[in-house]
Amino acid sequence: MITDRKAKAKPERGVEELLEYLGEDLTKPGVLNTPKRFVKAMEELTRGLREPPPEVVFFPLEYDVELGPVVIENIGAVSLCEHHLLPILLRISVAYVPGDGVPGLSKVIRLVKWAAARPIMQERFTEWLADLLMEKLRAKGVQVKVCGVHMCSFIRGVKDEHHNMITEARRGEIDVKLSCKRPLGCR
């Protein structure tokens, strides 16, 4: 989080101006601190823009064996649509073939959540995430499947609460059937 009070004043004023433009009464008790809360929420949802990626810890292979794919399904994450700054609820499944060492499970999940914490276009994000995982996991192969429910088409525009968008990317030699549950329940 950004802790400089002076730095936060400008975006908070911007939120106040937006609320006034929309016709909101800024003196209502429930709205008094909304600009501060909104800025704090945006900081949290975009922390991947400011924080360094989490360090990945590797465990050595204790015997000489060729490992098959490791699959982690349905990692929950939240991004923002870069066009509307509305949330995208994500379920991300990844598979990787370890290279020189096995990355810790929690570190892989943290890396995926960090990567998602920014404004994205899902198609481009999926490709970038595959490249990031290939590099950070020192993998021989990576496969990524991203299932997203975009609030920009869920609550506005076409207002379709039943859709989800699925994107996939593959790097190296890997072919796994990945699944991911719809972030707002299964159909």
Curated annotation (Swiss-Prot):
Quaternary structure (record): Toroid-shaped homodecamer, composed of two pentamers of five dimers.
Which protein, by its recorded name, is this?
GTP cyclohydrolase 1
Which PANTHER family does the record cross-reference, listed alphabetically? GTP CYCLOHYDROLASE 1, GTP CYCLOHYDROLASE I
- Catalytic activity field: GTP + H2O = 7,8-dihydroneopterin 3'-triphosphate + formate + H(+)
Question: What are the alphabetically sorted keywords of the record?
Answer: GTP-binding, Hydrolase, Metal-binding, Nucleotide-binding, One-carbon metabolism, Zinc
Q: Which GO terms describe its biological process?
A: one-carbon metabolic process; tetrahydrobiopterin biosynthetic process; tetrahydrofolate biosynthetic process
Task: Quote the cellular component terms of the Gene Ontology held in the record.
Answer: cytoplasm
What would be an example GO MF term here? GTP cyclohydrolase I activity
Entry's family note: Belongs to the GTP cyclohydrolase I family.
**Which pathway does the protein contribute to?**
Cofactor biosynthesis; 7,8-dihydroneopterin triphosphate biosynthesis; 7,8-dihydroneopterin triphosphate from GTP: step 1/1
- Going by the entry's taxonomy, the superkingdom of the source organism is recorded as Archaea
EC no. given is: 3.5.4.16
Keyword DNA repair in the entry? The reply is no
List positions binding Zn(2+): C81, H84, C152
